[in-house]
């Protein structure tokens, strides 16, 4: 399962994904910057239960998704709370894909609560 976690530049979302990784007990989780992940996506998906890609919200559009073949694997996009204003425009840009877009809870993101974030991500997948 591939999930994209994004913020303005990717720095904070990267730290957040690393907190999710630390909080995981049973899940095999892999964390990687979205551009780097494109080079070995198939291996990461095969070897892990959850692949968390992180980066900037601004780069996500149809062309980017297709370039890396993410349309076949991306299960969800999670926007940092400060990027919530992009949700509607992102939905329009990605309307040809069936990728749900969620907003990360402000308290969860602010506290860098990896345990709660992992629970939220997994619950949204059910």
Each language-model region and where it sits:
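Conserved active-site segments centered on acidic
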Residues: 2-64
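Gly/Ser/Thr-rich loops at beta-strand to alpha-helix junctions
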Residues: 6-14, 82-85, 108-111
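Hydrophobic, Leu/Ile/Phe/Ala-enriched alpha-helical segments that form helix-helix packing faces
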Residues: 20, 24, 28, 90, ...
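Conserved strand-to-helix beginnings and helix N-cap segments that scaffold or border functional pockets
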Residues: 14-18, 88, 114-115
